[in-house]
Amino acid sequence: MNNPNHRLSPPKVAGAFLAGIIMVAQMSPAYSQATADERNTIEVFKRAAAGVVHVKAVRVVATEVGDAVAGQGTGSGFLIDQAGHVLTNYHVVGGSSDVKLLLGGGRTFDARLVGTAPAFDIALFKAETGGAAGTDLLPLPLGDSDKLEIGQKVLAIGNPLGLHNTLTTGVLSGLSRDIPGAPVGLGQAFLQTDAAINPGNSGGPLLDSSGNVIGINAVVARDGQNIGFAIPINFVKKILPELISMGHVYQPALGFSALPIPPGMATLLGLSVHSGLLVQEVAEGSPAGIAGLRAGGRMIPMNDTVYVLGGDVLTAVNGKSVTSPHDLTVFLLGSKPGDRIQLTVVRGGERRTLVLTLPPMHF
């Protein structure tokens, strides 16, 4: 969110825009003379810009003399369907008492909160169009973030410093990044890009060269340059149905804690497998405890971390490899209370299969 005091004064804004217009007139080639890559950028922006939303959030608190505005800021979002659903970051709107959505063409709508997932930094709103037909809304197509390659072109559209529909371009710089201090549910999920992402871009779309949303821009590295991060759209697609139907995400508490096996340390720790999760603690009576999962009792300090050895090593869930707690989080997205999942563990050098029943939903 932007600091409302960090804004250009109107004369400076007008001057900056005028200078930009003059530069474009002098330097930009005619569309017919643009390179193929430039034409692609232009076309993607033209198609996507109308679906990008300027999010304005206000937090109002009661005082002894009446309500007072405690804070306000701006961010970005984007339409995902013609019903008017808009995705953005939770940190853009968290704690807000009033949210406005500025759509393409200058239309402003009140926003109705549909659902939030703070652990994943996701919020879903719906534009209150007052019964107007949604056929003129232009949602953005959601792509496939599991089929990305480092080096491919990406485009970010948002509202940095309140500048509506600003476009920046770059490449995909990294995959599966772990960001310290990020929401706990995201873990090693982030996409990294060198496309400029600034305050106000949060919640906006990261697009591929076909104009498909591959991520939601979320984080900028404060101590670096040209280092931004986005939440993969496939991660978001897994929780969308629950946000729409329930307003929140089912996150079952399994009742155990685990740490990944340190790279290259399996032999030193006397383990028979080289990847998986070392079960550290199991709560009595929990779903994991009932399933028969076991923790160890021998503690070894290593690299500022104390590992509990001698217990189960979780290697797979329903046949899919698990190498980090984040893998388990992703697997459980979209699951339902009562679902039975198979845990593959190594105990005493032997593989075993345990069956765990997911617990009821708690509100």
Question: Residue locations for each model-derived region?
Answer:
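Bacterial N-terminal signal peptides that target proteins for export
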Residues: 2-17
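Serine-dependent protease modules
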Residues: 31-275, 280-284, 302, 325-329, ...
